Amino acid sequence: MHGMLCDWEKFHELLKPLDEAFFTIYPAMDGCYDGSPDFISFADECEQIEQYVTGHFGGKLDAVWGASQGATLMSELLARNNIKVDAGILDGIYLAHQGKWCADCSYNIFLKMQQNGGEFPGFLRIICALMGLGKDDMGEFSLLYWKSSRSSMRTNLLENYTYRVNPGIAASDTKVYLWCGGKEPYARKSHRMIKKYLKNYEETVWPGMGHGKMLFSYTDQYMENIKETLLAAEKI
């Protein structure tokens, strides 16, 4: 599952090497593709996935992968326990719950970027610099879907920044792989939060890496990491 307000087709281009090793399915969140309905909630997205998997694959998947908000959505899917998933890779998961104020600020930033054709507002570059982040640490912005409606953007961001861990994930038998970079404070905080509930997980933190850095800058190695992880999971 792709990241927050991102174009699923751009994610597919990065992940194409996986098509050679696995039978892959690329869901797209509502509000993030041409002709789609507006985004409503993570629960609504999960229900659509559950209906598809139940109707086409008997309610079972060998594995799921999600990056950033996609990882958060996958955690909700696992917590609902309506389909069986053997393994889940959650990369850069976001469960920090910064609140509505952060959603409102992000909405204004995204709106300005949409109006400017995806260019970073000057004040955002300053904030990133103060945080020690360069533009290459924000690779996910290059994959955003800039035709999302204002309603989808606002609702999606509010869901993202107010979501909390669903305690139902404690009942999941899925083997969970938590991945993030060493320069991702919110993802690492999210790891600490979700590990309180998981009964079967492995954690990998890549030193010196920012949000999405492995996927966007070291794509070939990242693809190999996914393949090795999922093939190893089959042997468990």
Regions found by a protein language model. Give the residues of each.
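Conserved HGGG/HGGXW glycine-rich cap/lid loop of the alpha/beta-hydrolase fold
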Residues: M1-D34
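Active-site loop/oxyanion-hole signature of alpha/beta-hydrolase fold enzymes
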Residues: I25-A63
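Acidic catalytic loop of the alpha/beta-hydrolase fold
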Residues: G182-A187
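Catalytic histidine-centered segment of alpha/beta-hydrolase-like enzymes
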Residues: M209-Q221
